[in-house]
Amino acid sequence: MASVTIQTQAGKSTGSADLADNVFGVEPNMSVMHQVVTAQLAAKRAGTHSTKTRREVRGGGAKPWRQKGTGRSRAGTTRAPGWVGGGIAHGPKPRDYGQKTPKKMIKLALASALSDRAADGNVIVVDKWEFETPKTADAVAALAAIGAEGKVLVVFGDDDVNAWKSFRNLTHVHCLHVGELNTYDVLNNDVVVFTEETLPTGEAAVAAAGSTSEVSSESADSDDSDDSADSIDSADSVDSGEEEE
């Protein structure tokens, strides 16, 4: 079983934490990760594209010219697809791009992604976040102290409201509640930062039959993951209300 050093926000070592083999020690399955990420990105598509067919385009009710005797080809409407201003033949219509992905495949993909980051030493564990007030400068200093470079995924718990507000303005940092941990966000960032609180929670989520967050991503923006981050979301809504005032 692999282990990782636990650091304080200032970068000092306070001990070590064991990484579960079934989460951070599996052989990465590239094809499964690809399929799950493809499904996640497909589920994010709005699918609202729409074109008008010949029957939906306004006008074109009168026959342009008589059927015979003009020497021209037969025409019944000016809204046929071959005409300028006519309808579109076989054009896109609104559709759902969501794909059904087995829960075991979702679980394997997330474990593969976390194992890949752990193998490269890109999983960092902090004992806890200590932000008295939200301050982005303190977040920048904390990332430098713990050695998080490049694109960083920071996984928060329910009570890390000030930390969430401190990190969320950084363009190279993606903030995520532990209940929303998913394959795409892990692979889309170079480093994954957990706290002692969120690390075991994350292991339990992956070890289950399937992660709730990734199942909801299949159905494109499910409310289930939002319910698990009520405290953080409520803090965001309070901020927006203050800005409007």
Task: Give the location of each predicted region.
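Extended polybasic, low-complexity segments that bind anionic RNA or targeting/receptor surfaces
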Residues: 1-46, 92-245
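Glycine/serine-rich anion-binding loops at beta->alpha junctions
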Residues: 52-91
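A short, aromatic/hydrophobic, helix- or strand-capping loop or linear motif
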Residues: 47-51
